[in-house]
Amino acid sequence: MNISDEMNCWANFPAMVGYAAAHEALAEECMELAHAALKIARCLRGDNPVGSPILSYYSKMKEEYTDVVSCAIALGLQPNADISVWKWERHKKRLEEMEGK
């Protein structure tokens, strides 16, 4: 993940709005990202039409992802490689077990 140094401008956000509000902003942006991803999934499946082309939702998803990362920067959150690898291995094992059935 390549996060530009310019995005560190968000580091002062909690001091400006308070930590509770910064966490609320993260929660809201996560929900908006999830909503955009669900719209894309519906477009890809072709069921339950969403009314707009997939590219508009892809643009929205990129915007919301940037908002989530901005809030994470504000709260000093960073990805944890150990957790990520552990979760990938667990997920991969489940998929392999499903294929074997």
Q: Could you say what each language-model-derived stretch is?
A:
Residues M1-K101:
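Flexible "arm" and connector segments at domain edges
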